[in-house]
């Protein structure tokens, strides 16, 4: 019995020694290998120029960061079937073969960040990594995301793509990432957010898009983001944001929109109304235009502050000059179109209210102020705001040539003022007519002259005429 137990102890010791030898014996010269807390091969900052040969097959963690590795060949880690963490960040990687990570079905964390020469990744590189939950591709100089790059990464929760040179978000790029909770896209060159950019991200909690060049967001871009709690869009080129894009964000708690060239005119009314109802935490939304509202927070304005339209008259240039954009401007919004609003609110910036600008001086028929009409009219006559009531001359008094409503002559025959018994006596009427030097026209000659003559004579003159005609009594 004792002999059997002694044999078992020797066998157990032999197995333990064999396992230790498998880890320690083949450890590459520049690396340190240890078993606790997990089987680890650690080779950071050793000046390595290639992936070392002879990494223990039992390794669960491999640290190769901070070296001079420029290429990851195919099947470099195929023997490491138990690998869960692989760090290759802060190297000089310029190429990763499509099959570099083949066989790593248990891999959970892959860090490729800080490899500025990488620039592109083969779409098949991450295929087969079904358990991967964290992927670092930040600061890799990436210029595009190839089709199908993240296909099959159903377990991915954290995706770091910040500080690259990405210019676009292709449709359905993240479609398979149904469990993704954090997406970092800040610090790129993205100019627009298309409709299908974030399709399939039903679990997304945090979306960071700040410090890009975003000028347009499609109204349905955030349709699948019902669980999103944090959205950063600050430091972009946004002058307007459709509230249709914000409507699906029912769980949103943190919103940052500052450092954008917001135009606070009639186009901002829907966003203003949405912000009034938003109960989460939001940054200021400083206005860029019109000039009278520059620097003021859109959230703190009144609805009647958002009047008129700031319309560029010359060649288009981006409003915010901090970052150039190749995007073309959209057409006039509905509230700025002539059939939706008075043309007086669609004006050229910088043009004063004067008789030389017929558009500003025009007052539509039936648009007179209530009451007796004696007060000055407040007309939003430029994209830079409403003129005060004390402006001289009042806009309602400006009637430049050609601004009268059609169908009414601008000048006509002048009618001679007549006499009215309401305000004149009979004698005053006679004297006034005689003093006017006029009398009648040619129609008063002949038989019709006597009544006109008698109307214009004094009582003494009338008596003399009657005496001459009838003779002395």
Curated annotation (Swiss-Prot):
Disulfide bonds join 27-33, 31-43, 264-287, 266-335, 309-336. Residues 346-447 are annotated as: Disordered. LRR repeats lie at residues 55-79, 81-103, 104-128, 129-152, 153-176, 178-200, 202-224, 225-248, 250-273. Changing residue 277 to D: Decreases interaction with MAG. One of its GO terms (molecular function) is neuregulin receptor activity. Changing residue 227 to C: In SCZD; uncertain significance. It comes from the Eukaryota. Glycans are attached at residues 82, 179. The keyword Glycoprotein applies. One of its GO terms (cellular component) is glutamatergic synapse. Residues 434-445 have a biased composition (Gly residues). Keywords: Cell membrane, Cell projection, Disease variant, Disulfide bond, Glycoprotein, GPI-anchor, Leucine-rich repeat, Lipid-binding, Lipoprotein, Membrane, Receptor, Repeat, Schizophrenia, Signal. InterPro entries: Cys-rich_flank_reg_C, Leu-rich_rpt, Leu-rich_rpt_typical-subtyp, LRR_dom_sf, LRR_TM_domain-containing. GO terms for biological process: axonogenesis; cell surface receptor signaling pathway; corpus callosum development; negative regulation of axon extension; negative regulation of axon regeneration; negative regulation of neuron projection development; neuronal signal transduction; positive regulation of GTPase activity. Residues 1-26 form the signal peptide. Its main location: membrane. It is found in: Cell membrane; Membrane raft; Cell projection, Dendrite; Cell projection, Axon. Residues 413-429 have a biased composition (Basic residues). Changing residue 377 to Q: In SCZD; associated with disease susceptibility; unable to mediate down-regulation of axonal growth; does not affect interaction with MAG, RTN4, OMG, NGFR and LINGO1. Receptor for RTN4, OMG and MAG. Functions as a receptor for the sialylated gangliosides GT1b and GM1. Besides, functions as a receptor for chondroitin sulfate proteoglycans. Can also bind heparin. Intracellular signaling cascades are triggered via the coreceptor NGFR. Signaling mediates activation of Rho and downstream reorganization of the actin cytoskeleton. Mediates axonal growth inhibition. Plays a role in regulating axon regeneration and neuronal plasticity in the adult central nervous system. Plays a role in postnatal brain development. It is linked to Schizophrenia: A complex, multifactorial psychotic disorder or group of disorders characterized by disturbances in the form and content of thought (e.g. delusions, hallucinations), in mood (e.g. inappropriate affect), in sense of self and relationship to the external world (e.g. loss of ego boundaries, withdrawal), and in behavior (e.g bizarre or apparently purposeless behavior). Although it affects emotions, it is distinguished from mood disorders in which such disturbances are primary. Homodimer. Interacts with MAG. Interacts with RTN4. Interacts with NGFR. Interacts with LINGO1. Interacts with KIAA0319L. Interacts with OLFM1; this inhibits interaction with LINGO1 and NGFR. Interacts with OMG. This is Reticulon-4 receptor. It comes from Homo sapiens (Human).
């Amino acid at each position: 019995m004792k002999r059997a137990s002694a044999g078992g102890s020797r066998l157990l010791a032999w197995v333990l020694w064999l396992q230790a030898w498998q880890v320690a014996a083949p450890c590459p010269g520049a690396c340190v290998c240890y078993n606790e807390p997990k089987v680890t091969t650690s080779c950071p900052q050793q000046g390595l120029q290639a992936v070392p040969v002879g990494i223990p097959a039992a390794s669960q963690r491999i640290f190769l960061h901070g070296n001079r590795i420029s290429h990851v060949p195919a099947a470099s880690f195929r023997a490491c079937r138990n690998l869960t963490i692989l760090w290759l960040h802060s190297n000089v990687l310029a190429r990763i073969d499509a099959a570099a990570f083949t066989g790593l079905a248990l891999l959970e964390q892959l860090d490729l960040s800080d490899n500025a020469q990488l620039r592109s990744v083969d779409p098949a590189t991450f295929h087969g990594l079904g358990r991967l939950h964290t992927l670092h591709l930040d600061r890799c100089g990436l210029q595009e995301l190839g089709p199908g790059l993240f296909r099959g990464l159903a377990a991915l929760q954290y995706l770091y793509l910040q500080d690259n040179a990405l210019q676009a978000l292709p449709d359905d790029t993240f479609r398979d990432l149904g469990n993704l909770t954090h997406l970092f896209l800040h610090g790129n060159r993205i100019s627009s957010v298309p409709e299908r950019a974030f399709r399939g991200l039903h679990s997304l909690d945090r979306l960071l898009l700040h410090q890009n060049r975003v000028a347009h967001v499609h109204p349905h871009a955030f349709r699948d983001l019902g669980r999103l709690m944090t959205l950063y869009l600050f430091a972009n080129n946004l002058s307007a944001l459709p509230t249709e894009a914000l409507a699906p964000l029912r769980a949103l708690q943190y919103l940052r929109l500052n450092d954008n060239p917001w135009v606070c005119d009639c186009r901002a009314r829907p966003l203003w109304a949405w912000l009034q109802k938003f109960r989460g935490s939001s940054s200021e939304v400083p206005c860029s235009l019109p000039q009278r509202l520059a620097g003021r927070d859109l959230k703190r304005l009144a609805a009647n502050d958002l009047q008129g339209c700031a319309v560029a008259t010359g060649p288009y240039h981006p409003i915010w000059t901090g970052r150039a954009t190749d995007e073309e401007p959209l057409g006039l919004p509905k509230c700025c179109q002539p059939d939706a609003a008075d043309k007086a609110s669609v004006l050229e910036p910088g043009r004063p209210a004067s008789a030389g600008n017929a558009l500003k001086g025009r007052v539509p028929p039936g648009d007179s102020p209530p009451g007796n009409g004696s007060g000055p009219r407040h007309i939003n006559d430029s994209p830079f705001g409403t003129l005060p009531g004390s402006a001289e001359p009042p806009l309602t008094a400006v009637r430049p040539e050609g601004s009268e409503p059609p169908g009414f002559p601008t000048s006509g025959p002048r009618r001679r003022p007549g006499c009215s018994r309401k305000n004149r006596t009979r004698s005053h009427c006679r004297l006034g007519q005689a003093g006017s030097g006029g009398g009648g026209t040619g129609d008063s000659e002949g038989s019709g002259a006597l009544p006109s003559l008698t109307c214009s004579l004094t009582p003494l003159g009338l008596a003399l005429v009657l005496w001459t005609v009838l003779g002395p009594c």
